[in-house]
């Protein structure tokens, strides 16, 4: 991710929109859409805040979480819908030289026309989408103080007179669910933006392990840039299934060596069907009911307090 902090001018931006996304449909005039859907995560053991990345780096042996990726179905009046990924992200080129950000569930849209607006998280309710645009490298962190117009940056990415539309959608999950919805939505948005700019090998399908780790690291970056903070286990929905996420001691080959005891990113061990048989998975699935408490909470102050302690 180091290159994102070194780009200080729009002319130095290395990313380009994937060629397949630059040709509009001749009938509708609309450009192709990148669609990404992601699970949310359930933390069965509670990490005890050990997954805050710099705490895990100080004491990697104590950073362990049993984490499950889940799709959700709603139960209304005795009728249950089919399970589906609870968060979705979409990216496409538009024929206007601006950055259009839209949250379907919040019913909010804004047109961003300057680089400074991208970094203004207090201006509207779309800070998560702004964080994704920054952390994915579309508007890299190093360009925050650049004086060039956003239009120039978008022209370099997608061509003159063009811009990007980034859309998020959360499917019927109440606030305060404790399922790390915002972090996994951030990861989904980052993955979609990375696909659109050729930073992922394919425009659709599963991410590779290396790609997942990049998405997770950028989700951490996006959370802290946006001011909400967070830990690495919250992006567990990017990985499938039931997994053990644990801190790893830094070795001589790691950039963290000599700086901290542990690595920035943890190790993800996805349990196979020999370790957790299908019957056990089925029993676990059938024994869980999620009931929302209806209490939304800003965990930023709590994270700050835990970190200070």
PLM feature segments, named:
Residues 124-128, 162, 181, 185-189, ...:
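Generic hydrophobic, aliphatic-rich segments that mediate packing or membrane embedding
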Residues 168-178:
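Cysteine-centered functional microenvironments
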Residues 1-155, 174, 197-205, 209-229, ...:
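C-terminal nucleotide
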Residues 154-168:
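Acidic-glycine-rich active-site phosphate/pyrophosphate-binding loop
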Residues 177-201:
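DPxDG-like acidic metal-binding loop motif
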């Amino acid at each position: 991710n180091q290159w994102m902090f070194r780009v200080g001018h729009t002319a130095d931006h290395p990313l380009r929109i994937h060629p397949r996304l630059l040709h509009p449909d001749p009938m509708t005039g609309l450009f192709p859409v990148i669609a990404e859907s992601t699970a949310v995560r359930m933390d069965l053991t509670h990490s005890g805040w050990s997954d805050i990345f710099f705490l895990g780096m100080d004491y990697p042996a104590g950073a362990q979480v049993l984490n499950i990726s889940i799709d959700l179905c709603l139960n209304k009046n005795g009728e249950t819908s089919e399970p589906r990924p609870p968060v979705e992200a979409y990216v496409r080129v538009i024929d206007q030289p601006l950055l259009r950000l839209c949250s379907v569930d919040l019913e909010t849209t804004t047109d961003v026309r300057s680089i400074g607006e991208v970094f203004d998280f207090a201006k509207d309710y779309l800070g998560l989408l702004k964080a994704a645009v920054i952390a994915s490298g579309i508007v890299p962190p190093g360009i925050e103080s650049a004086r060039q117009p956003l239009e120039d940056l978008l022209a370099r990415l997608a061509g003159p007179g063009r811009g990007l539309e980034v859309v998020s959608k959360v499917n019927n999950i109440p606030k305060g669910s404790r399922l790390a919805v915002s972090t996994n939505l951030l990861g989904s948005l980052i993955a979609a933006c990375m696909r659109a700019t050729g930073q992922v090998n394919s425009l659709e399908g599963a991410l590779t392990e290396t790609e997942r780790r990049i998405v997770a690291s950028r989700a951490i970056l996006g959370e802290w840039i946006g001011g909400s903070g967070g830990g690495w286990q919250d992006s567990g929905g990017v990985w499938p299934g039931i997994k053990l996420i644990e801190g790893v001691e830094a070795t001589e080959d790691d950039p963290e060596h000599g700086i901290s005891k542990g690595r920035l990113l943890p190790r993800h061990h996805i349990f196979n069907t020999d370790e957790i048989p299908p019957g056990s998975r089925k029993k676990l699935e059938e024994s869980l009911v999620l009931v929302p408490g209806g209490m939304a909470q800003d965990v930023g102050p709590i994270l700050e307090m835990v970190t200070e302690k």
